[in-house]
Amino acid sequence: MKIKFTLLLMACLLLFAGQGEAKKWVSLFNGKDLNGWTVHGKAKWSVENGVLVGVGGMGHIYADAVCTDFEAKGMFRISSDPGSKSNSGFYFRCNPPADNIDGFPRGYEAQICHNQDAYSGWLWKPGTPTGKATELLTKDNEWFEYHIKMVGEHIQFWINGKLVMTYDDKEYKTGHFAIQGHNPGMKIEAKELYYREVK
């Protein structure tokens, strides 16, 4: 009986140790420079006071990290000049288009936008709103936390800790994380970007 209990205890310890490894958060952004990221398009990217900043028009910055089943989280803020619209997105399981027809990543986008019908919390695929958010919880010039989880075909978004979107889709299997600069006159800022694999 004692031997069985010892073996059971060892099995539990090994199980929890494995889960601990699977749940380790990994930083996507070092807060100092663009190391670990690749720029595509016209948008200009820089680091200011520990914040990743994108301005100047359409373009995307891709993280080197590749994700399949994962959780990701980060703090985001968008703003725009008078007369312009603020629009951005946090992409996942995405890759640059091979033919660069429109420059948009091929993958999933967690929308960041406060002034259109498909606002922050919506799921987009290239040019198409796909999963609808339950409510708008973000504003221009205010930081908010995005938390994304995708395992297999199941996608979930949380904003500031509140679940706002669930959807199932199987088109894109694996790819990078990316952030979008959408149009002139707007600015996207991001910090505290992390992800972890889910096994």
Model-derived features with residue positions:
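Bacterial N-terminal signal peptides that target proteins for export
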Residues: 1-7
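Bacterial N-terminal signal peptides
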Residues: 7-16
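Carbohydrate-interacting regions of secretory-pathway proteins
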Residues: 20-199
